[in-house]
Amino acid sequence: MFSESTLYDQDTFYRAFMRDLLHSKDEVIIQSPFITEKRMRTLLPIFSKQRSRNVRIVINTRNPNEHDGDYYYQALNAIYELQALGVTVLYTAGHHRKLAILDRKVVYEGSLNILSFNDSCEIMRKIASEKAAKKLCAFIAIDRYARSK
């Protein structure tokens, strides 16, 4: 009845997530309201590697105009770099979801901003379930906003 899940905190999340991210074969969907240069320095090389393997990457975030000061410029620059790699970037006003769906088989969801986390107490749950991943894709209506390859 229940899918097996694994819990991570701010200290254990990225090791597991980056391993799974590198093993993704078809598609990566990330929803994260904030994007910072510091986090992107870690993730951009992985995104680049995955794009060279023709892995589809879709990121849903806030429009940079919703950020103030330095966060505006960090988001704007990161989005430019992501788009240069061929990453599809979507904007949702007031966005605050924090999740990732890998190959429509693995879900990560919780409180951690995947593209910006720096220094706070967080929780993320990994669910390895094709059924849960497809249900979440339907719930966030990703196929309506980002066409499949």
Q: For each of these PLM feature ranges, what is it?
A:
Residues M1-D9, I29-I35:
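Acidic/glycine-enriched edge-of-secondary-structure segments
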Residues Y8, N60-R62, T92-G94:
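Conserved beta-strand termini and adjacent loop/short-helix elements that scaffold enzyme active sites
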Residues D9-F17:
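A short, well-structured juxtamembrane/interface segment
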Residues Q10-D11, E37-M40, V89:
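A conditional alpha-helix N-cap/helix-loop micro-motif detector
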Residues R19-A84:
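Primarily the HKD phosphodiesterase
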Residues V28, V87-A133:
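HKD (HxKxxxxD) catalytic microenvironment of the phospholipase D
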Residues R41, D70, N118-E122, Y145-K149:
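A short, polar/proline- and glycine-enriched secondary-structure boundary/capping micro-motif
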Residues K134-K149:
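Cysteine/selenocysteine-centered motifs that mediate thiol-based redox chemistry or coordinate metal-sulfur cofactors
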